[in-house]
Amino acid sequence: MTAKPHISCQFKRDYPQLINLYPTCTIATQHSLDNLNRLRHQCLTALLTQPSPHLCVMGQWGLGDGIELLSFIHYWQTLAKTQNLPRLLLKVFEPNPINYYELKLLWDQSQSLILHPHLQPIANAIIEAKPARIIGCQRLIFDDGRISLDLDFGDLQTMLVNQPHCGTYPIQQWLILPHLAPQLSRKILWQMARLSADDAHFIGVELAETTQNLAKTCGFSPLTITADMLCGEQIDSIASQIVTDDILLHERKLLRQQANNHQAFTPRPSQVASTKQPIAIIGGGLASAHLMLSLAEREQSSILFCKDNDLGQGASGNRQGAIYPLLTPENDELSRFFQQAFLFSRRRIAALSLASMKGSDVASGVMPISHDFCGVLQTGHDERSQQRLDKIIQSQDWPAEIAYAVDASEANKIAKIGIDKAGFYYPLGGWVCPFEYAKAAVDKASQLANVQCHFNTEITEIERDAKGWYLLSQDQRFGPFRQLVLANGAQLTQFSASERLQISPFRGQVSHIPSQFQLSQLATVLCANGYLTPSHQGLHCLGASYVKAAEHLDFCPLEQLENLGKMQQSYPNQDWVEDIDISANSARVGVRMVTRDHFPMMGCAPDVNEIWARYEQHQINQQQAEQIRHYWQTTPAPIHDGLYILGGLGSRGLSSGPLAAECLAAQLTDEPLPLDWPTLNKLSPNRMWLRKLLKGKAL
C-alpha cells in the first residue's frame, strides 16, 4: 500500500507570483521560436563540423517561462533524427528556484503548451523529473544521456564563481533572456567568460547597449536580436561575428588559472578518458553499477571486476532500503548535497523502471526495479532525538517537495497505522530494492556502450608502471588500464594505495519481518530509532544494527532483538508493534563504509605517504605558517595518478551513490560537473588531511 497525501496545499506561490518571477519572453510565436533555434544552431556550425565532437554545452541566463528551453530541446531532438549530433548539455542559471508543481501550474495557467502542443512531451518529462526549489545544480537526463539539463538555482554570482571550469567542454553559447539581462554585472560577465570557450557566442534578446558594451569588455561579441528580426524571413543572414581580443582572452586564461589554483587542494584527473580504452572498476555494488551507467551514457567503455558471482552481494544486497535526503538545521553543504543526490537517484529509478517496462524483460534487457515512492515519515524516539528533529524542521523554510512537518493526526493518515506523534514527512521519498537497482543500471549501461563484467574475480593486488594500472587476481593479471576506480565497498582499503583512507566499516543486520495484521497496513517508510519499510513480497525490512569493526558477518540473535527494541522504543503502546515477529531469525548482514563527516568519497586517490612526507618537511619551519597554508591551498595535492575512489556511501548510499558516480564519470571524461567547488572539496578522498593542513593544524 502506498501513502498518497495531497501535498499541493503545501506550495505557497500562485500563478500571478510565478509569472512575475518567470515572465514570458517577447518571442511568443512558433515562427519566432523556430527562427531563434535555427540561429542558435547556425552559431554552432564550427563546433558541429569538428571531427566527432562528443558534447555541446550551452548556457541560458534565466529560465523565463521555460518555452525557449523546451523549444530548443525539441529542435535538437528533431535534428538528431537525421544528423549525427553530439550529446547536448543545457545549463540554465536561474536565481529563483522553482519546483515541478509550480512549473506545471505556470505552463497550465499561461496556456503556453496549448499554443505549442509539440512541446508537451518534453514538458511532461521535466515535470516527471520532479525538480525542486533547492539551491544548487539539479541534473536531469533524457534520451539515454543524449540530452542533459542542469538547473542551476541560486544566487547567480555565487553559482558562477563556484562552477569548476571545464577545459575540454566549455560553454559554447549563451542565450540571455531579457528579464535577467539587467543582472549582468562586470563581475558576473567575467565569470561567464571564465566558463566559456574563447569563441563562445553571446546571444541576447533585445540587449541594452550598456549590457552589450559590458559584454565586450569581457571578451564577448554580443549578438542582440529583436522580436521583429525573429518574425522575419532573413534569419539565415543574421550572423554572430566573433571578434577576439588577445588581451581579454589572456585575462580569461588568468582567471581560470587563478580559480584552479585556489582549489588545487582538491585534485582533478590529470588525463581524460578515451572511448577506445576501457576504464577498470573494482566493485559490484550500487556505486560501481551507476558509474558504469554514467560512463556508458558518455559512450565510455568499462570493465567491472567483481569478487562475487553476481551484482549486489555486499551492502547493496538488502531487499529494501529507504531513499530520502539527509537534512541538517543549517542546510549546509552536506544537506544540500543530499537533496541534490536524492532527487538525482529518484530520477534514475524512474528512468530505469520505464526502460524495463518498454517491453518484456527479455526484450528490454533491463531488470525491473522493485520500489515504491511512498514517502518517508521521520519521528523522534526520545527527548533528544525529538529536539534534534524539531530543530531541523524549524531552522529552515524547507521546500514542501523535500519535507514538511505533520501533526499526529496527519502522521496517522500517511502511515495508515497508529503513529500518534508529530513528524517530518518526505513526500518524494520511499524505498527501493538495492541489488535490483544495481543490476538495472548495468543492464542499461550494456545497451549504451561496451560494458564487461568479470564475476568471481577477486582482485588481490593492484600495481602501476609507466603504461598504467594492473589488476592481479590469484591466477590472472589484467591491464594495463589508464584509469582504475576502486568502488569495492567494504574492501575499499584492502590495497596499499588505499589502506590509509579515513573510513570505517560498520556491520548492519536488517531483519525480515512477515507482513501480518495491522502491520500489513503500513503505507510509508518509518524512520525513528531504526527504520521499517512497507511490505514487499510478504515481508517488511526492519533495521538496522550499527556495529563498528565487527568480527564476523554471521546472523546475530541479539541484534535481531535490538532491531525490535528500536521500534518498541520509537512507537510505544502501538498495537501494530506487537505484530512484529522476529522468531524466524530471518535477516541479512552487510558492511557499509562510513566517513566521519557523512560525505561519500569521490575523486582522485590521495597519495597519503607523500602528503605526510610534505607535511613533515614543512613542519621544520613553523614560523612560516601562513606560507605553508598557502602552499597547501595552491599546490596540487599528491595523488596516485590514474587511480580513483568511489565509496564511503554509509547508510544513505541509495540517495548519494548515483550522483557521486555521475560526478566521477564527468571528471573522468572532463565534462561539466553537476556539483560546485565547495561540495567537491567535501567529497574529496583527501579531505580529512587537507582540511587540517589548510587550517595550519597538525596531522
UniProtKB/Swiss-Prot annotation:
Transmembrane segments: none
The organism of origin for this protein: Shewanella oneidensis (strain ATCC 700550 / JCM 31522 / CIP 106686 / LMG 19005 / NCIMB 14063 / MR-1)
Gene Ontology molecular function, alphabetical: flavin adenine dinucleotide binding; oxidoreductase activity, acting on the CH-NH group of donors; tRNA (5-methylaminomethyl-2-thiouridylate)(34)-methyltransferase activity
Cofactor: FAD
Cellular location(s): Cytoplasm
Family designation: In the N-terminal section; belongs to the methyltransferase superfamily. tRNA (mnm(5)s(2)U34)-methyltransferase family.
Gene3D superfamilies reported in the protein's UniProt record: D-Amino Acid Oxidase, subunit A, domain 2, FAD/NAD(P)-binding domain, Vaccinia Virus protein VP39
Catalytic activity entry: 5-aminomethyl-2-thiouridine(34) in tRNA + S-adenosyl-L-methionine = 5-methylaminomethyl-2-thiouridine(34) in tRNA + S-adenosyl-L-homocysteine + H(+)
Region: tRNA (mnm(5)s(2)U34)-methyltransferase, residue numbers: 1-260
Entry EC no(s): 2.1.1.61, 1.5.-.-
Keywords annotated in UniProt: Cytoplasm, FAD, Flavoprotein, Methyltransferase, Multifunctional enzyme, Oxidoreductase, S-adenosyl-L-methionine, Transferase, tRNA processing
Record protein name field: tRNA 5-methylaminomethyl-2-thiouridine biosynthesis bifunctional protein MnmC
Principal location listed in the UniProt entry: cytoplasm
Domain of life per record: Bacteria
Signal peptide: none
Record Pfam families: DAO
